[in-house]
A protein has these predicted regions:
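TOPRIM metal-binding catalytic domain and adjacent DNA-binding surface shared by DnaG-type primases
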Residues: 1-37, 71-72, 108, 167-188
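Active-site-adjacent alpha-helix of alpha/beta-hydrolase-fold enzymes
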Residues: 127-136
């Protein structure tokens, strides 16, 4: 539980499971159930120590994490790469650095303004390309070096500042998104 608290997840601990037997492939991992309409359809298990692989996933293909929690919230839908970001800021996660056509359909079915928040690293650049392909807005928050994603930003700046910085950094113009992507690529 100390790991979850250190990542700013204290208020969300009830959403996680911990492998109490501490052996096998789930040793030293927190387990996050994946649901669709309240039914478990898979899980992701994240290591809490320095070991590879960082994640184990078992879920339906093209799954979009956290849709059950965003259906009745906000007028926008924040799309992240990682589950932790999605939980902390009530968004969804594609759990990779791309968005499949099937995931795009699921995201669009939420009926919200879509804002993609890529990780600030090289793989995040690929997510920007997919956002452009699907006509989504992209957020380019100005966080300090070493702050790779929204979870890192929450730990450094707090939840409110992180959310405001995301919402105040949204670009909808494809030309401006391309320019900001080039600037970002020079810094990652």
């Amino acid at each position: 539980y100390a790991y979850l608290e250190s990542r700013g997840m204290a208020e969300h601990i009830d959403r996680f499971c911990v492998d109490l037997e501490q052996k096998g492939p789930l040793k030293n991992r927190i387990i996050l159930p994946m649901t669709i309409d309240g039914k478990n359809v898979g899980y992701t298990a994240r290591t809490i120590v320095d070991q590879k692989p960082k994640y184990y996933h078992w879920h339906q293909s093209h799954y979009v994490f956290n849709t059950d929690y965003v259906k009745n919230s906000y007028k926008y839908c924040l799309v992240f790469e990682g589950n932790m970001d999605a939980i902390l800021l009530n968004g969804v996660a594609v759990m990779t650095n791309t968005i499949s056509p099937e995931q795009s359909i699921i995201i669009n079915s939420l009926g919200k303004e879509v804002i993609v928040v890529p990780d600030q690293d090289k793989p995040g650049l690929e997510l920007i390309d997919k956002a452009l392909e699907y006509g989504y807005a992209v957020s380019f928050p100005k966080w300090e070096e070493g702050v790779k994603d929204a979870n890192d930003a929450i730990i450094k700046y707090g939840k409110l500042f992180t959310l405001v910085s995301i919402l105040n950094s949204v670009e909808t113009s494809p030309a401006k998104i391309e320019i900001k992507k080039k600037i970002m690529s020079a810094n990652v």
